[in-house]
Every structure is written in C-alpha cells, then in structure tokens.
Amino acid sequence: MQDRFIRSITQLPTPLADALIPLLHQGFAGHIDAQHLAELVKSSNMTESEVLLALLPIAAALAKPPISEFYVGAIAKGKSGDIYMGANLELPGEALFHSVHAEQSAISHAWLSGESQIVDMIVNASPCGHCRQFMNELVDGGQIKIHLPSQDSHLLSYYLPYAFGPKDLNVQSPLLVKQETEFALDSSDPMVIEALDHAGLSYAPYTQSYAAVVLETADGATYCGRYAENAAFNPSMLPMQMALSNLTRHNRDFAEIRRAVLVESSQGKISLVGAAMDALHAVAAIELEHIVVDPI
C-alpha cells in the first residue's frame, strides 16, 4: 500500500479497509472499476452509497494543497459504473486561479479514461460555485446527483438553479462527448505524437484553441492533460493544470518532471502558452516545448 493512504485507511470501517488495501498498490491512482466496486460493497456489507462516502478520505489523500492545507477529495461515478477519484491541487507561490478543484480533478480523470458520462459526484465538502459551473458543462450536467456526508443527495440543478451552460451558447456537444479535431504535423517523437492526439480530443468550442500538454518523468512515464473550456470561461480547466493533477494522482513528484510539451491549434482565438509556462515554472525548472499545429 502507498504511504499516502496509511492515515486515511484507518478512517474506514474495518471490513471495507481490509477489502480495499489490496487495491492500493503502487500503481493505484484513484480508479476503481465497476467489478471491484461491487466487491467492496459485498465485502463491507454496506450500500454502494455508503461505500462511496466512506472512500472520500482515500480520495482526499491524493490532494496537494500547500496554500490552503485543506484536503478535498471527490469521486466521480461514470455511466460505466467505474469510479474516478480526484483531489485539489494548489501550486506553491502562484496565483489561486492556477488551482485545480477536487471535482475538476475527478472529472478530468474520468475524461482521460474514456468515460462518456458522469452520473454521480461524491465530495467531502459542498461544491463551490466554480465546480458547480464546471459540472454543468458535462453531458446532462444538471442531472448529476451530488452526494455529501450527512446530507441528502440532490441533483446539480438543485445547487445551480437557472444555470447558464453550453446550450446558451449554441454548443450541442458538451464536455465528455467524444469529439476529434485532426491536425497536420510530421513528427516521429512519441511524446509530441501523444500531445497531438490529446489536443485533437480536447474541448474548446468557444475559442477553438484545442490544446494538450504531456509531461515526461525521468523514467520515461508520461502524463497528459487536455484543455477543457467552460461556457462561463473562468472555470475552464487548462491542460497544464490537468497534466499536473494527473501526475500527482499517480503519486509522482514535480521534481521528477524532465520534459514538458504543449501542442495547440494555430486557429485558436487565444494561446495557452503563457499560462502553461507560469504553471510549469512554479513546480519545475525546465523549458516548455511549444508546438503550434494547423487543423486539417
């Protein structure tokens, strides 16, 4: 079991903890498939809802909040039945807008894993307005059921009445609907190709600034992040922040980053290079490789 879960595992009921420990191996980064979730429910003699709420301390253990020191964990349950953990991330010494909220982390985890719809969000603190707006960008976002400890469950539409969302800006394919933009680039660099692929899968209906970041650690492992825009603009999730969140979920340290690549469209209304460099340089003293590509 990873050291970061030692304290949180003690907060779980013993039968659930005993069933969960084998899953918390070195490669665990917060994903539990539907079959393993069903086994946890059976072994713990708890309901699924009770298990998901009980797992929140495990999700919160993924957090990296050097500024607030407030650990927030979130669990997104997909239509597939799989669950995806996420946690808040803050960049030391940097402006607060660089922060990743736990719900954003969990949703990006699900998106990068190929999930097509979120049906439940379990979180250990009431979602802030920023996160409510971010969730509203998703497929049937208003119908996502929000679960909080010691509170009744409600749909997102309860927490965000009279919502402004993608349809108000004539966007008919919201976040998590698979969309692919093709770009022209001649490269044999595997890391650049990976970034290009993820840029094509990014979500930028308001600026067409399709973009992705890939980070590489010294052992050759790579961690990606895609741009995810929001109808309200400010809650958009930047690709560097998503990549850094992905890296920390996998229990990797910022000091291990050896290479960083940003690929973005030449036809976008904005560029993400400045924001990406600021975030990267807050945690790693390496240069950002910036590649601009033309859509086909």
Curated annotation (Swiss-Prot):
Record the organism. Answer: Shewanella oneidensis (strain ATCC 700550 / JCM 31522 / CIP 106686 / LMG 19005 / NCIMB 14063 / MR-1)
One Pfam family here: dCMP_cyt_deam_1
Show where the CMP/dCMP-type deaminase domain sits: 47-167, 186-296
**Its function?**
This enzyme scavenges exogenous and endogenous cytidine and 2'-deoxycytidine for UMP synthesis.
Q: Does the keyword Hydrolase apply?
A: yes
Q: Which Gene3D superfamilies match?
A: Cytidine Deaminase, domain 2
Sorted alphabetically, which keywords does the UniProt record give?
Answer: Hydrolase, Metal-binding, Zinc
Cofactor binding note from Swiss-Prot or TrEMBL: Binds 1 zinc ion.
Instruction: Check the record and name the PROSITE patterns matching this protein.
Output: CYT_DCMP_DEAMINASES_1, CYT_DCMP_DEAMINASES_2
Q: What is this protein called?
A: Cytidine deaminase
Give binding positions for substrate. Answer: 88-90
Needed cofactors? Zn(2+)
